[in-house]
């Protein structure tokens, strides 16, 4: 009869031997090596263009490009920047626009006064119903 400790040690040794054999066999198969290379090649290949414009959950996660663009909102395209007008050009246009606005204001105010006067005259001359 063996002691319980010896039985446990024997069972552990046999289980360790089995697992190590399995791991060695898996690591040496050419299929697993090809699978690892395939995964690495997919990671480093450039993203393919995808022209799907849908933003549903299925379309946002169907490829890495759509996930980055639609899911995360990251876009690496060059954005078009507006051209700023030179300071001198701004000063010239602002002074010219101020000169144009002054006569327009006086033109609009005069017809409104005339309309108010005609409305007041019409109300004053119209006979109203008394009490």
From Swiss-Prot:
Record bears the keyword RNA-binding: yes
Pfam families: Tat
One annotated GO molecular function: RNA-binding transcription regulator activity
Residue ranges annotated as motif Nuclear localization signal, and RNA-binding (TAR): 78-84
Biased composition (Basic residues): 80-90
Annotated spans, Disordered: 80-131
Origin: domain of life: Viruses
InterPro entries assigned to the protein according to its UniProt record, in alphabetical order: IV_Tat (IPR001831), Tat_dom_sf (IPR036963)
Major subcellular site: host cell
Location of the region described as Cysteine-rich in the Swiss-Prot/TrEMBL record: 50-66
Annotated segments matching region Core: 67-77
Positions with biased composition (Basic and acidic residues): 109-120
Keyword rRNA processing on entry: no
Record's compositionally biased regions (Low complexity): 121-131
GO cellular component terms listed in the entry, alphabetical order: host cell nucleolus
Subcellular location: Host nucleus, Host nucleolus
Assigned keywords, A-Z: Activator, Host nucleus, Host-virus interaction, RNA-binding, Transcription, Transcription regulation
GO BP of this protein: positive regulation of viral transcription
Biased composition (Polar residues): 92-101
Family: Belongs to the lentiviruses Tat family.
Subunit structure: Interacts with host CCNT1. Associates with the P-TEFb complex composed at least of Tat, P-TEFb (CDK9 and CCNT1), TAR RNA, RNA Pol II. Interacts with CCNT2; the resulting complex is unable to bind to TAR RNA.
Described purpose of this protein according to its UniProt entry: Transcriptional activator that increases RNA Pol II processivity, thereby increasing the level of full-length viral transcripts. Recognizes a hairpin structure at the 5'-LTR of the nascent viral mRNAs referred to as the transactivation responsive RNA element (TAR) and recruits the cyclin T1-CDK9 complex (P-TEFb complex) that will in turn hyperphosphorylate the RNA polymerase II to allow efficient elongation. The CDK9 component of P-TEFb and other Tat-activated kinases hyperphosphorylate the C-terminus of RNA Pol II that becomes stabilized and much more processive. Extracellular circulating Tat can be endocytosed by surrounding uninfected cells via the binding to several surface receptors. Endosomal low pH allows Tat to cross the endosome membrane to enter the cytosol and eventually further translocate into the nucleus, thereby inducing severe cell dysfunctions ranging from cell activation to cell death. Through.
Name the record gives this protein: Protein Tat
Species of the source: Simian immunodeficiency virus (isolate Mm251) (SIV-mac)
Gene assigned in the entry: tat
